[in-house]
Amino acid sequence: HAENCSGELLRAVHDFAEKHDLGYTIHTNQSTWEVDYMVKWHGLRPIEYFAKHDFLGPRFIAAHCRYVNAAEIALLGRSKSIVSHQPGMAGNRGANPPIPELRDAGATIAMGTDNNTNDVFTVLRVGLITERMRRNDATPGLLPQPEDIFEDCTLGGATAVRQATSIGSLEVGKKADLIVVDTLKAHLVP
């Protein structure tokens, strides 16, 4: 959590990850209390604080991001950071991150569980439904498509763990575990 990290710690983690070709993650912007605390004590919102300490980038996995503002969304996108979206937890807390805006800004979206459910199909379904609700499109149900959420779960996840060149999509030379899903079963219809 941002409120528990000094700038020195953030830089040390970043430098260690760079040196050893690793990714790193932190839970952030998951409550208004956290954002208010950071503004009160550091004069910056969490993502701005991370940017100040060179913590953002393609190795950085930001879990949650439910309360990011437009400036933070832009920082995450420009830095090619990864947002790990936990739809089950977001639904449980009643606050969904602005996934469409994050995606449009250039952030990679990955899916996570964070303890509410470990059933990947539930994560996918809740992610699809909550993103559609947040979009509030005039023509409901067009975006995202199930394929978009599936890509967040597969290629987004592979990108998050720095393995997108070897897993995450069906391509010649990549490793893959395959399953067959009967989408005609009522509980699996997107």
Language-model segments: residues:
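A short, polar/charged loop-to-alpha-helix boundary motif
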Residues: H187-P190
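Residue-level marker of alpha-helix boundaries and capping positions
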Residues: E3-N4, A63, M89-A90, P144-Q145, ...
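Histidine/acidic residue-rich metal-binding segments in metalloenzymes
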Residues: H1-I82, R93-I109, T165
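Short, acidic/turn-prone active-site loops that include or flank metal/cofactor-
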Residues: Q30, P87-N92, D114-N116
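His/Asp/Glu-enriched, well-ordered alpha-helical/loop segment
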Residues: K52-R59, P100-K185
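Nucleotide-sugar donor-binding loop of glycosyltransferases
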Residues: T28, P87, D182-L184
